[in-house]
Structure formats: structure tokens, C-alpha cells
Amino acid sequence: METIFAQSSSFGKAGVAVFRVSGTKSLEVLKLLTGKSNFKPRFMYYQKLTSPESNDLIDNAMVVYFKAPNSFTGEDVVEIHTHGSKAISIMLTNALLNIPGVRLAEAGEFTKRAFLNNKFDLTAAEGIADLINAETIMQHKQAIRQAGGALEELYNSWRSQLLRIISLLEAYIDFPDEDIPESVLKDVTNTHKTLINTISEYLNDNRKGELLRSGLKLAIIGPPNAGKSSLLNFLMRRDIAIVSNIAGTTRDIIEGHLDIGGYPIILQDTAGIRGESNDVIEQEGIKRAIDSAKKADIKIVMFDAETLDSAVNEDITGLIDENTIVIINKIDLIPENRIFNIENKYRCLKVSIKNNIALPSILKNIEEIAENMAGFTETPYITNERHRHHLKQALVYLKDFNLDNDLVLATEDIRMTMHRIGAITGIIDVEEILGEIFKNFCIGK
């Protein structure tokens, strides 16, 4: 394979910039850049870097050589740590490009080579990508567990059980006249039933892992002028929505990203929902608000305490479910002991966004719902639609398995189940999906 390189750190001004080189010419590249002939693997050296063509000094750098297979990619690898300067990065990149047999790496190519050299499986590679993209503590916990091989271990345990079924049955395929012993039939049947139940239950996870990976959508809905935009600004801790006492100020969906209790929340402030409007633009805003609420994982339904009874309508209450927080805003403007009809049906939070009354309770309720929907558990969840697709197909083959059928055909159902699970981890030939997975990595990883 060609020797590749890339800047693994961000391009720009920084304390340190890190370049990575991987391939058979890595050590030769290091010698050309430094003029030094001997490098002990896994030792850092302070060296002058010069351009092999012009002999111009590039920088004083720290360099280290990792000898195959004891490196991230499994190949010879060199890391070069320079000062974080755009000029230095450009000069070093040009110097490397001018060395024959060395080229710039494609996105995710270092991780792809590590996978091809059996450093980890595909689920761990995806975990590394998720770890790089993690923005919250809970996303980090899920990603680092996957990168550490938790999903690989789970899926391989299922493959091992399937392999055991095949090994038990294949012993009798060549001897069709012999009856399969009762003990073998019982072992196969029990393992088969257990796997069906285990994988079925695993798939019935309400997409918790995928929600945590992508973020939970939270739609703020309610009648006009209830304080929805003020709530969005409070949650975002900055003004991203226009706040006005004029009904219908918000026409389109305004979105913001938030970390609540370690859970990634995608906030959506929507247009006020009211029964009648002659404004075509406002009508479209209301339609989008309702659509947004229907697709949301969490909903906040907000009412103005002064106009609540007249503002409640089926368009709004019809959207309330178990993952909805009902908020009565502007309680500072009404008598303290007032009870609303809506409180007889739903648990409501009484707050004042403007006067900072009971606002922590909103954050607490959001976190509780998020934890219930995407909370961290001992068993690693499915984090990727690719895994779910293959597991569903595996379950189809597993359910088709029947010992009353021809033994060869029955064994083939188990083999196809193994094939589908192997496609998740990369045990089988999966060249057609590698490009799709690794293109989402950054250059230099």
C-alpha cells in the first residue's frame, strides 16, 4: 500500500500541530526530513525538520517512530509534532508531497487501514468516529464503550452460539441415515430459542443508542405569545429568538443545540398555534409547528397563565404524550392559589421566564425524560441504522430455521444469520460498505 500522511490536528494557529505518516516508507520519510539515520521505535526525538528538496528549515519538532505492527494502523507509523502554525503546516505538507511514493490521506484512511490490519472491528471504528464527534458526556460514554469493543464482544458472542449450532448439525449432514441424538436436538433448540428472544429484545430498544448519538429533538409548542421564544433564549443562555408581545412573531422553526445533564438536545422553537389565522405565512408556520411536534422526541407545551383557558385547543392538547412537559408561564401575573382546568388532566409546571421563577424545574424534567429515552445501561445499545438493518435480517433467517426441514437447508439459515451479524463487525467481506463508513471521518484519522 502507498504511504500516506495528513495533519491530524486542526489546521491553524495552535500550540502544537500533529502530522501522521503511515506505510512502508514512513521511516524513510522521517530520515529524509531530519537527516538522522537511526530512530528507536516508540522514543520521542527533538529534531530539526528541513525540506528534502530545498534544504530550508521548516521547524524544530518532536518526532516518534512506531514500528509495525505495534502502531495505530498496524503499519510503520511516524508522528511529527510541530508548532501550530499555518505556515509550518503548509511547508511540511509541501515537503511530504514532494517525496516519491507518498500521498495525502483520504478521509478516515488511517482508521480504515487499522481495520484492514485487524486492529479493531467495524463497530469499534464507528465508535472512534462517534467519539471524535461526541459533544456531551453521555455521547462520550456511549462512544468510548463502543470504541473499546463492547458491541464487537456482544455480536461475536451471538456468532459463537450460531457457530456451535452449525458444528453440532454439520456432523450429521454427511450421515443422513443417522438420527440426531436427543441431547443434541435439545441443545440446538434451546440455543436457537434463546438467540431469537435475545436479538428480538435487543432490537426492541426504542432506538435509545441512536437517539443519544444523533440528539433528542425537543419542540417548544403552544399558542402565540406564551413565552416560547423567551424559554428558548433561557435554555440557550443567549438571545437567538426575537421576543415580542405581538402574537405571531415567530413564523418559522428556530433551532439550537444544548447539553442537558450530558444528553444532546436539539431545541426547536415553533410558531404559535391558534385556531384561526388569515395570514398565509402564519398558517404555514402553524403547520410546520405541528409537524415538528409530531416528529419530536420531547415536547414542551407552553401556555400563558393569563389567557390559558381560552388558548387550550385540540390542536395543542392532541400533541401531548408521556414525553411532554406542560408549562404554565407568567404565573407572577395571576393569583398564587389559582388552579387551572388543565391541571386536572396533566401535571403542569408553573413558572415565570421573565422573573426567573421555578426555571430549574424545567431543566430537571427535560433531563429526566432524556434519561428515560436514551439513558446509559450496562448492555450497549444499537447506535447505527446499519447494525439494526443487519440484525433484522439475521432475525428473519433465525426464525426460518426449522429442524423439521432438510438439514442442509436448516443449517444454511443459521449460516446466513451468522453472515448478517458478521457484516456488522466486518468479519465477512464488506468492501462495499467500507467507503460509506470511513468517508465520515476527518482527514488525518
UniProtKB/Swiss-Prot annotation:
The keyword Magnesium applies. Its main location: cytoplasm. GTP binds at residues 225-230, 244-250, 269-272. (6S)-5-formyl-5,6,7,8-tetrahydrofolate binds at R20, E79, K119, K445. It holds the Pfam family TrmE_N. GO terms for molecular function: GTP binding; GTPase activity; metal ion binding. Mg(2+) binds at S229, T250. K(+) binds at N225, S244, I246, T249. It is found in: Cytoplasm. Keywords: Cytoplasm, GTP-binding, Hydrolase, Magnesium, Metal-binding, Nucleotide-binding, Potassium, tRNA processing. Its cofactor is K(+). PANTHER family: TRNA MODIFICATION GTPASE GTPBP3, TRNA MODIFICATION GTPASE GTPBP3, MITOCHONDRIAL. Exhibits a very high intrinsic GTPase hydrolysis rate. Involved in the addition of a carboxymethylaminomethyl (cmnm) group at the wobble position (U34) of certain tRNAs, forming tRNA-cmnm(5)s(2)U34. Homodimer. Heterotetramer of two MnmE and two MnmG subunits. NCBIfam families: mnmE_trmE_thdF, PRK05291.1-3, small_GTP. Belongs to the TRAFAC class TrmE-Era-EngA-EngB-Septin-like GTPase superfamily. TrmE GTPase family. This is tRNA modification GTPase MnmE. The gene is mnmE.
